[in-house]
A protein has these predicted regions:
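Intrinsically disordered, low-complexity regulatory regions enriched in serine/threonine/proline
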Residues: 2-4, 93-123
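Negatively charged, low-complexity tracts enriched in Asp/Glu with abundant Ser/Thr
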Residues: 2-59
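Generic detector of ordered, mature protein regions
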Residues: 45, 49, 54, 64-66, ...
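Intrinsically disordered, low-complexity regulatory segments enriched in Ser/Thr/Pro
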Residues: 60-107
Length: 123
């Protein structure tokens, strides 16, 4: 393929791009929250209507922040962060944390949560 340096950008045919439709928009957060109906999780809705869900052993946390997550002492807001999922590790294996924007489709978060819950086992 020859490159024409005189032309800025690139050119291609629409067929070559193989355009797709992608899931967009926040969706319904209850698709995520409803997965925690069993008694092994605590639910808290705070005064900002943020939802906090945790496992009774304290190792799993899910936070839903429809208007963005509030920041720490040095920051006003962590803008755009709508979902936080964290699993605390052990003395041997580290845990993990992930966050998603306020406009991440709830269906995608629900899929991630379902996978995490499927891997957890009572001791």
């Amino acid at each position: 393929m020859a490159l024409d340096a005189a032309q800025p950008g690139f050119a291609t045919r629409a067929e070559a791009l193989r355009l797709r439709s992608w899931k967009l928009g926040a969706g319904q957060p209850m698709q995520v929250i409803d997965q925690f109906a069993e008694a092994g999780f605590t639910h808290i809705v705070d005064d900002r209507a943020d939802v906090h869900i945790g496992s009774r052993d304290g190792r799993f946390y899910l936070g839903y922040f429809p208007n963005g997550r509030p920041g720490g002492v040095d920051e006003d807001w962590v803008t755009g962060e709508g979902w936080v999922i964290a699993v605390t590790g052990t003395a041997i294996v580290p845990g993990y944390r992930m966050s998603f924007g306020t406009e991440t489709p709830a269906e995608i978060i629900a899929g991630v949560v379902a996978q995490i819950l499927a891997t957890s086992q009572p001791l």
